[in-house]
Amino acid sequence: MSQILKTSLLIVGGGPGGYVAAIRAGQLGIPTVLVEGAALGGTCLNVGCIPSKALIHAAEEYLKARHYASRSALGIQVQAPSIDIARTVEWKDAIVDRLTSGVAALLKKHGVDVVQGWARILDGKSVAVELAGGGSQRIECEHLLLAAGSQSVELPILPLGGKVISSTEALAPGSLPKRLVVVGGGYIGLELGTAYRKLGVEVAVVEAQPRILPGYDEELTKPVAQALRRLGVELYLGHSLLGPSENGVRVRDGAGEEREIAADQVLVAVGRKPRSEGWNLESLGLDMNGRAVKVDDQCRTSMRNVWAIGDLAGEPMLAHRAMAQGEMVAELIAGKRRQFAPVAIPAVCFTDPEVVVAGLSPEQAKDAGLDCLVASFPFAANGRAMTLEANEGFVRVVARRDNHLVVGWQAVGKAVSELSTAFAQSLEMGARLEDIAGTIHAHPTLGEAVQEAALRALGHALHI
């Protein structure tokens, strides 16, 4: 083992939370070491958020081209297209490489020492790193920030290998299967399943719950289910997985009837879990919430000067939550007064149509004892949506009846992910219905549906 490396802040994990914490710490003049065994950017940048959106975009463009090869109301006609999936993957990888290089450059710019290797906890002040290039390095610190992220949940009855793949393999196909079965009807399975279907693959989704996206209310998920069926995706809802079969998988429905679903490949997408095993984290004896490290509203763990952020600290497992926590921890270590208490953290499903939620749903508001106004505005009445051939879906607002304080937003439709900023900002700033309704929204935009939903809640929507 080489000479001991000493630092003020040691960060384990170079994903969105870890690298943002490192950059902010560097900006604040805190000597910082970041340890990452894989590529900078973590799951999100390398095998999650970014590559999946690239594949989704490529699949959508291919579907458009196929549509134009038949009949298009726009008058566009092209010859039947083909796709070179290897080139698609190269394009996707180039985006990832550019972004990871950018992260590395930012860390270097702010004086962060990046150590490539796998950290193993020794105690609350030190780790041993198995260096990627061979050998080992002991690092000691004043503050230890745990940002190890999460990993895919595996199914013992359907182990990975051969034709059974995880989202990581699904994002880098060497070739496209003829038929794909997706196990899991959550956002990961549906995003990838939709992309594969648009690329021409026959897709079936198996979900144990009676509907897709069970974490969202049915009014939001119904348009997604309808769109999937129109696309030709087979939905086996309320079906439990029994295991692999010779030609695919075996499932059982609610009535106890078993059947085989044929597949060339099976994608397991049944969720993620904190990466809290395999690097001696348990030796610290930290308070835990199941597999997640328990933290307070400053991301402090039960051990002094040991912090945890992002997926390792539990739900919601979102990159933007991890980034916000990472920035906050760096500022706390620098002596600033901070607290992680967002009014809302937006969440997006990049299905087709997309789904975005921020704050309380009508049901959640009711459960919280709030008497609320709930109003929706359909994209069928929005001019911009019509010009985009995307008049499916709606924007919904939830606001207190007594003072009109907005407590929640939901939307389903084309490109509604871009409304998430407006939703979160209005909630964070304590906007009331009158604030949204009285703000002039540019025309023609999808965002006008936000204003119209607020107007409708007040009883005087203009375009419906």
Curated annotation (Swiss-Prot):
Cofactor note: Binds 1 FAD per subunit.
GO cellular component, one term: cytoplasm
Database matches in Gene3D superfamilies: 3.30.390.30, FAD/NAD(P)-binding domain
Pfam family, one: Pyr_redox_dim
Transmembrane regions: none
Amino-acid positions noted as binding NAD(+) in the UniProt annotation, renumbered to this chain: 184-188, 207, 269-272
Entry GO MF terms: dihydrolipoyl dehydrogenase (NADH) activity; flavin adenine dinucleotide binding
Enzyme Commission number(s): 1.8.1.4
Catalysed reactions, as listed in the record: N(6)-[(R)-dihydrolipoyl]-L-lysyl-[protein] + NAD(+) = N(6)-[(R)-lipoyl]-L-lysyl-[protein] + NADH + H(+)
KW NAD (keyword) present: yes
Reported cofactor(s): FAD
Keyword Ubl conjugation appears in the UniProt entry: no
Signal sequence range: none
Superkingdom per UniProt: Bacteria
Active site (catalytic residues): 443
Residues bound to FAD: 36-44, 53, 119, 311, 319
Cystine bridges: 44-49
Note: The active site is a redox-active disulfide bond.
Job description of the protein: The branched-chain alpha-keto dehydrogenase complex catalyzes the overall conversion of alpha-keto acids to acyl-CoA and CO(2). It contains multiple copies of 3 enzymatic components: branched-chain alpha-keto acid decarboxylase (E1), lipoamide acyltransferase (E2) and lipoamide dehydrogenase (E3).
The protein's name: Dihydrolipoyl dehydrogenase
Recorded name of the encoding gene: lpdV
